[in-house]
Every structure is written in C-alpha cells, then in structure tokens.
C-alpha cells in the first residue's frame, strides 16, 4: 500500500486529478474486463478508448474487481488519473457518447489522490441466476445459466453454508488464475428460489478466477442429488 500511496502523491503533485466512475455493462460480447493483447474485445479497452476521447489524452483504468468473460456488471467502480479538467456530467455524458450500447458510465466523481478502486473496495458482490426448468429460456440465454434437472434449494442452501467464512478455495479457482493466494473470505452466500429462477447472492472480500461459477456448479450438482451436501466442504 505504501507504493500506491507514493504513486498517488506523485500524481497529485504533477497536476493530475483522480476520477472515479460507476460503470455497468453486459459482458456477452467481451472477453472479460481485462484488456487483451490480441485485440479481442474487453470492457477495459472499450472504456479506455471512450474516455481517452473525452480527456483528449490516453486514459488507463483501474477497477474494483475484474470480471470474467460473459459476466455482466451493474455496480463496477473504476478510477483513472488525468490532467483534463471536465465536470462530472461531462465525463458521464462524454464517455457514453463514445460507448456501445452494452457499456454505460452511470456517475463520475473527483476523488482524493489516495483513493483506489481496487484497494479501497470493502467487498465484491455477485449474483448468479439459474433458470431451473426442463425447457431452456429463449430470451434469457446470456443472462442466466439453464439447468433442466430439478434442483433442491434446501440442499443447495445447506451446502452453501459450508463455504461462508475464510477458506482455501483452491478447488474453486481456474487453472490460469493469477491470484497470489487461494485464501478468500466469503461474507455472505444466500440461495433463494423465485419460481423457475434460483438466485445465488454472494459477497466476499475478493474472488478467484472462475470462483463464482465453480461454486454455482458445485451447488447445482448437490441440488440435483448427484453429490452429498458435505461435498461442498
């Protein structure tokens, strides 16, 4: 954190402003948040291109949490440093005028130099929605996971309780995960049914690559009766 604070002080001394933005996006067309070297579309690159036009200079973004390919966001927070003097409204309206229909900036605010979207985040929250019916949905395909097997919500909720707290989530991370430690703390994991929809609401200090979708996969397997509840341990 000391290096980050020093960098923030240097940026402020050089006449830079730190701007935070609220962002929402539909991730279906993107290879996740992170900028891709091979030119494959990413949310980060799309936003940086739009903001650079508003700032009339290159913009480099830092986010609260990197989302995987196909993942949507409704409350992503990002920040960047710039010498460009713009009002909050100008950042929002200007960025949105250069963004595609599936990415939107919802608010902007100048922040103190020590603010950091990633390291000042208190927690990250995901909502994973399962469409549980024999017939696949026609209009929700890229916003839900379809599971045709009858899922027992009580078994899923019981299994979810094992995951709350601080644990080693190595079994739930992707092989290419770059996180230094598999130890993460889940603050809240609730499983509820709303008709054909089963919603997993999960809040944690941070997540590993593919951690949420792997948790969902384990809970669905248990809910289908293919594994015992204790398999989630």
Predicted regions and their residues:
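Structured-RNA-binding interfaces characteristic of tRNA pseudouridine synthases
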Residues: 1-233
């Amino acid at each position: 954190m000391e290096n980050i604070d020093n960098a923030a002080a240097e940026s402020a001394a050089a006449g830079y402003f730190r701007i935070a933005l609220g962002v929402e996006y539909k991730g279906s067309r993107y290879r996740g948040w992170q900028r891709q070297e091979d030119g494959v579309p990413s949310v980060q690159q799309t936003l940086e291109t739009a903001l650079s036009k508003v700032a009339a200079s290159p913009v480099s973004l830092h986010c609260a949490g990197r989302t995987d390919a196909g993942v949507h966001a409704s409350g992503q927070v990002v920040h960047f440093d710039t010498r460009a003097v713009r009002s909050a409204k100008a950042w929002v309206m200007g960025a949105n005028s250069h963004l595609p229909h599936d990415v939107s900036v919802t608010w902007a605010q100048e922040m103190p130099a020590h603010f950091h979207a990633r390291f000042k985040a208190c927690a990250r929250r995901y909502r994973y929605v399962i469409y549980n019916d024999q017939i696949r949905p026609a209009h929700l395909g890229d916003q839900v996971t379809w599971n045709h097997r009858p899922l027992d919500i009580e078994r899923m909720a019981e299994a979810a309780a094992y995951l709350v707290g601080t644990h080693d989530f190595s079994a739930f991370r992707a092989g290419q995960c770059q996180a230094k430690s598999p130890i993460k703390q889940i603050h809240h994991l609730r499983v509820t049914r709303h008709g054909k929809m089963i919603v997993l609401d999960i809040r944690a200090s941070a997540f590993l690559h593919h951690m949420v979708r792997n948790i969902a996969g384990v809970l669905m397997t248990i809910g289908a009766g293919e594994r015992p509840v204790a398999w989630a341990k």
